[in-house]
């Protein structure tokens, strides 16, 4: 098999949550433990940092990896979902896993894993851990896929746990209250391992305190902590929500230093300033065009969209254009209720089975007082927005990671840079 055939095999043979939703979700760690034992417990050969949370965990994971890279470490980074290429999920010092490694792994191991019927994420996690061990990374930043307690990354024994925040997302699996969701994400807290909590609410803070007490784990709340100031520090990530992510990371760094990581001020400044360049991070308030301004962002739930709306309010423009698509298992009405009513809307859908048809999205949007036209795919919607916009206008593309993925996959055809 070549690389593309291998990906086709993976996408068709093992259920992928990003594509099909809940039918791909496997609760429990049984498969993960079997795979881990088969591959010789590879995660035990390198240090780890475990990152969970509803929003911001990708940005925090990439930034931590960038800082450690700049400090001279060989750093693995495991995140999800990918936007353009599967290999984005598994990186060492910013470089994606080689195509040849993915092909060899699947060819060599398929007879073992096929009878297990693993989920896509279970298998991808096994590939990542084996690759990091084979390549002898010093440390790896591991982002939780979904939840925490039963996520297949939760077999690691990290130096530090980090939980960014709690908002409503994946409620069909994690629970329908903030406290229940917090309980699932608090499941990554381990005995005696420090945990940093980025943001809390009155419903979630007691959950974290109780779990930390049960595990005798030191818990540090970023919002209550005095952090070291770095005057004039620049960050490559521009979204308003990055302010809280930055505080969370700066709270975590002294704990990593106490755990023996050698991280100096220059590494911290450089990691923040060049995170996208160092790690390949995309889709976080990312500018793709100057005239008119075109920004994309992967925010896709009420918590993430609320920050985006606040940032849109700060933009000075003649007319706001919003290209939006969503998947069918989100709080669609809750998101639409947040969006500005004076924008011109371009309703579309991503190329995934979970995508909400654009006509259904427009009907729901009309109930929220939003008006616009429908387009069959992201390139058509973005092209329409470009054609109808004035140089002093502002185009925003988002609503789903998959909308941003389709945009980035077509950026050359759309003449975006």
Placement of each model-derived feature along the sequence:
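Glycine/aspartate-rich loop-and-adjacent alpha/beta segment that forms the canonical ThDP
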Residues: 400-417
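Extended acidic/charged loop-beta regions that coordinate divalent cations
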Residues: 81, 124-173, 205-234
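Nucleotide phosphate-binding/pyrophosphate-handling subdomain across enzymes
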Residues: 139-144, 152-162, 166-170, 180, ...
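ATP-dependent carboxylate-amine ligase catalytic core
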Residues: 22-29, 34-37, 41-44, 70-156, ...
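Short internal beta-strands
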Residues: 78, 194-199, 322-324, 343-351
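Short functional linear segments
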Residues: 1-53, 60, 66-71
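Internal gly/pro-rich beta-alpha loop/helix module
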Residues: 173-180, 185-188, 193-254
């Amino acid at each position: 098999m070549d690389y593309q055939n291998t990906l086709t095999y993976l996408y068709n043979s093992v259920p992928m949550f990003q594509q099909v939703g809940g039918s791909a979700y496997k609760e429990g760690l049984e498969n993960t433990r079997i795979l881990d034992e088969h591959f010789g417990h590879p995660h035990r050969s390198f240090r780890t940092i475990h990152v969970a949370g509803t929003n911001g965990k990708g940005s925090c994971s990439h930034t931590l990896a960038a800082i450690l890279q700049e400090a001279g470490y060989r750093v693995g980074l495991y995140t999800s979902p990918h936007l353009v290429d599967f290999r984005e999920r598994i990186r060492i010092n910013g470089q994606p896993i080689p195509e040849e490694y993915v092909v060899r792994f699947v060819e060599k191991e398929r007879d073992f894993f096929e009878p297990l019927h693993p989920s896509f994420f279970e298998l991808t996690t096994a590939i990542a851990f084996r690759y990091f061990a084979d390549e002898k990374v010093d440390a790896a930043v591991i982002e939780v896929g979904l939840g925490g307690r039963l996520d297949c990354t939760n077999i690691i024994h990290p130096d530090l746990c980090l939980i960014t925040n709690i908002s409503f997302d994946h409620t069909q699996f994690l629970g329908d209250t903030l406290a229940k969701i917090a309980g699932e994400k608090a499941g990554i807290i381990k005995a005696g391992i420090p945990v940093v909590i980025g943001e809390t609410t009155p419903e979630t803070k007691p959950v974290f305190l109780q779990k930390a007490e049960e595990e005798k784990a030191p818990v540090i709340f970023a919002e209550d902590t005095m952090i070291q100031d770095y005057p004039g520090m620049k960050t490559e990530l521009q979204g308003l929500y990055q302010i809280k992510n930055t505080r969370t990371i700066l709270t975590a760094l002294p704990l990593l230093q106490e755990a023996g990581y050698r991280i100096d001020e220059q590494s911290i400044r450089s990691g923040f300033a060049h995170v996208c360049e160092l790690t390949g991070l995309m889709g976080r308030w990312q500018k793709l065009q100057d005239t008119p301004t075109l920004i994309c962002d992967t925010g896709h739930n009420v918590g993430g969209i609320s920050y985006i709306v606040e940032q849109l309010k700060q933009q000075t423009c003649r007319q706001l254009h919003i290209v939006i698509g969503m998947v069918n298992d989100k709080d669609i009405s809750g998101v639409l209720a947040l969006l500005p009513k004076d924008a011109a809307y371009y309703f579309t859908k991503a190329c995934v089975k979970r995508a909400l048809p654009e006509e259904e999205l427009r009907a729901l949007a009309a109930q929220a007082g939003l008006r616009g036209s429908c387009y069959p795919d992201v390139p058509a919607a973005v092209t329409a927005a470009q054609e109808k916009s004035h140089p002093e206008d502002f185009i925003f593309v988002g609503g789903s990671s998959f909308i941003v993925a389709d945009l980035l996959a077509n950026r050359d055809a759309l003449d975006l840079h």
